[in-house]
């Protein structure tokens, strides 16, 4: 039986379904660490068995020299056992921490269930004020968890020079609120750190290290992350003219993907030849002029070809003629034709810095799916659920603002007055205090569906205007005073304005409504 609601809040099952990651992440962490611990135990046990067998062979020689060897072997075995013991103690502490997180989270949601159970027992006599206060406090804590999750994911990791430690505002917020056991911030920080290294530092080492640690899991998922990371490493080596390491990277890390990514490998091979040949053609006295792929991609195709050719050869792109001006070998002819045709479009995507964003999205997708983490921030999910219930067909009309901005310079005085009146009714009446239309939530609300409202609200003093629209009489009179006070429109005494179509009517022309 579902718990009775106090103010239309969702039940416990709803929160559990939306927060499965709070229990799935610790489960994955425990699984990974148990597998790692078992592998270490098997390895060290095998090593101890080998040492024991060697020690037994030494004991067969009953002399002083072999006794010293036996003593050294026993000392080494004791050192290994101590090392295993320290390792196991460390692992046990980490297991206890993870289990304690799960326990705290179960208690957190059990608290919500208990509050709802108390409400069902006190609602008959109306004495539920204490329960209501507890529920509000629970939701305040839960909101802080959502905020901490969002900050941990999206805020950068900063370095404190005084304490010589790294910190994140989301983790600091969670610890200050004593909610750090209710979220796996260490996992989110790892994703944040690798993502920052890709987007802002252009550093592949953290990503490659993470790929090596989770290679088995990525292989089972048939992930292309490793190939794309190694391909980006290869491209970056070519950009700095490090052809030797680029070839080693190609042979060692890219060739194993020849069956699954043959087309991409052909393009990567062509990129090596293309850049090497172009650099050989550069004048020795010239310096690099920069290669802005973002600017080139925004230009037309002929301009792209000219800019790329200009970058590599420091001269204009030659035009195709009916006959070659000079006699060349067969290889030179084919090269000349390719260069004259400007067929560089296929290499632009490889050289584009946008690949870093694509690689980051691919990493986050694999990382979050590995731990069962939602790729969308839980805070934004809750905001979307709430805002979607407020979205109507009158929300989000960008054409109103755009038209006003475009016609400001050429508008006459009369048109300017009409425009000011339109902006006033738009922002002060139609969109006043509307979260859907606010600049803060507009990026979230644009893709949301409209709400399905099946109930209407009646005005306190409804009147029917001649155009068929119904409004509150007091609010129309208040609007008329505001418009005259701000000199937005000229209204005679006893006149009112419809805020939708901005037509002016006399109060005597309106009809008082009596809803039944």
From Swiss-Prot:
It catalyses: S-ubiquitinyl-[E2 ubiquitin-conjugating enzyme]-L-cysteine + [acceptor protein]-L-lysine = [E2 ubiquitin-conjugating enzyme]-L-cysteine + N(6)-ubiquitinyl-[acceptor protein]-L-lysine. Keywords: Cytoplasm, Metal-binding, Nucleus, Transferase, Ubl conjugation pathway, Zinc, Zinc-finger. It comes from the Eukaryota. Pathway: Protein modification; protein ubiquitination. GO terms for biological process: negative regulation of apoptotic process; negative regulation of gluconeogenesis; proteasome-mediated ubiquitin-dependent protein catabolic process; protein ubiquitination. The record marks 434 as: Essential for ubiquitin ligase activity. Its main location: cytoplasm. Its EC number is 2.3.2.27. Residues 187-245 form the CTLH domain. GO terms for molecular function: ubiquitin protein ligase activity; zinc ion binding. A zinc finger (RING-Gid-type) spans 434-501. InterPro entries: CTLH/CRA, CTLH_C, Fyv10_fam, ZF_RING_GID. It is found in: Cytoplasm; Nucleus. One of its GO terms (cellular component) is nucleus. PANTHER family: E3 UBIQUITIN-PROTEIN TRANSFERASE MAEA, MACROPHAGE ERYTHROBLAST ATTACHER-RELATED. Component of the GID E3 ligase complex recruiting N termini and catalyzing ubiquitination of proteins targeted for degradation. GID E3 is regulated through assembly with interchangeable N-degron-binding substrate receptors induced by distinct environmental perturbations. Required for the adaptation to the presence of glucose in the growth medium; mediates in association with the substrate receptor VID24/GID4 the degradation of enzymes involved in gluconeogenesis when cells are shifted to glucose-containing medium. Present with 784 molecules/cell in log phase SD medium. Belongs to the FYV10 family. Identified in the GID/CTLH complex. In the absence of stress, the complex exists as an inactive anticipatory complex (GID(Ant)), composed of VID30/GID1, the E3 ubiquitin-ligase RMD5/GID2, VID28/GID5, GID8, and the RING-like subunit FYV10/GID9, awaiting a substrate receptor to form the active E3 ligase complex. When cells are shifted to glucose-containing medium, the substrate receptor VID24/GID4 is induced and becomes part of the complex, named GID(SR4). This is GID complex subunit 9. It comes from Saccharomyces cerevisiae (strain ATCC 204508 / S288c). The gene is FYV10.
């Amino acid at each position: 039986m579902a718990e009775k609601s106090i103010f239309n809040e969702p039940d416990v099952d709803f929160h559990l379904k939306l927060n499965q990651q709070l229990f799935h992440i610790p489960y994955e962490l425990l699984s990974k660490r148990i597998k790692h611990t078992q592998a270490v135990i098997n390895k060290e046990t095998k090593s101890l068995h080998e040492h024991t067998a060697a020690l037994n062979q030494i004991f067969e020689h009953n002399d002083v020299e072999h006794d010293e060897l036996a003593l050294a072997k026993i000392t080494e075995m004791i050192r290994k056992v101590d090392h295993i013991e320290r390792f196991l103690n460390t692992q046990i502490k980490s297991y206890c921490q993870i289990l304690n997180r799960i326990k705290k989270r179960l208690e957190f949601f059990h608290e919500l269930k208990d509050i709802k159970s108390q409400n069902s027992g006190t609602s008959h006599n109306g004495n539920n004020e204490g329960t209501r206060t507890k529920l509000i406090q629970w939701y305040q804590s839960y909101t802080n968890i959502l905020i901490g999750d969002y900050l941990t994911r999206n805020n950068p990791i900063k370095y404190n020079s005084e304490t010589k430690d790294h910190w994140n505002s989301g983790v600091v917020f969670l610890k200050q609120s004593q909610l750090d056991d209710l979220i796996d911030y260490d996992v989110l920080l790892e994703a944040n750190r690798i993502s920052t290294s890709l987007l802002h530092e252009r550093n592949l080492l953290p990503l490659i290290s993470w790929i090596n640690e989770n290679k088995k899991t990525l292989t089972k998922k048939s992930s292309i992350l490793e190939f794309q990371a190694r391909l980006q490493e290869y491209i970056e080596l070519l950009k700095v003219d490090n052809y030797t390491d680029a070839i080693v990277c190609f042979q060692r890390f890219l060739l194993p993907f020849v069956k699954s990514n043959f087309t991409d490998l052909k393009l990567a091979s062509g990129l090596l030849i293309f850049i090497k040949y172009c650099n050989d053609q550069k004048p020795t006295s010239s310096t690099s002029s920069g290669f802005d792929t973002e600017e080139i991609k925004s230009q037309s195709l002929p301009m792209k070809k000219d800019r790329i050719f200009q970058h590599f050869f420091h001269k204009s792109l030659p035009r195709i003629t009916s006959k070659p001006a000079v006699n060349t070998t067969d290889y030179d002819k084919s090269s000349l034709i390719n260069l004259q045709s400007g067929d560089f479009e296929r290499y632009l995507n490889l050289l584009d810095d946008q690949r870093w964003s694509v690689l980051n999205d691919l990493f986050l997708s694999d990382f979050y799916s590995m731990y069962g983490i939602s790729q969308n921030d839980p805070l934004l999910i809750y905001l979307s659920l709430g805002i979607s219930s407020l979205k109507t067909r009158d929300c989000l009309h960008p054409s109103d603002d755009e038209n006003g901005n475009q016609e400001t310079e050429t508008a006459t005085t009369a048109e300017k007055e009409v425009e000011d009146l339109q902006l006033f009714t738009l922002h002060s009446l139609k969109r006043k205090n509307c979260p859907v239309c606010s600049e803060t939530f507009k990026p979230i609300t644009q893709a949301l569906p409209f709400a399905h409202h099946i109930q209407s609200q009646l005005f306190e003093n409804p009147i029917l205007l001649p155009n068929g629209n119904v409004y509150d009489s007091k609010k129309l009179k208040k609007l008329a005073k505001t418009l005259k006070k701000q000199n937005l429109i000229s209204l005679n005494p006893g006149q009112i304005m419809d805020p939708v179509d901005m037509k002016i009517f006399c109060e005597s022309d309106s009809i008082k409504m009596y809803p039944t």
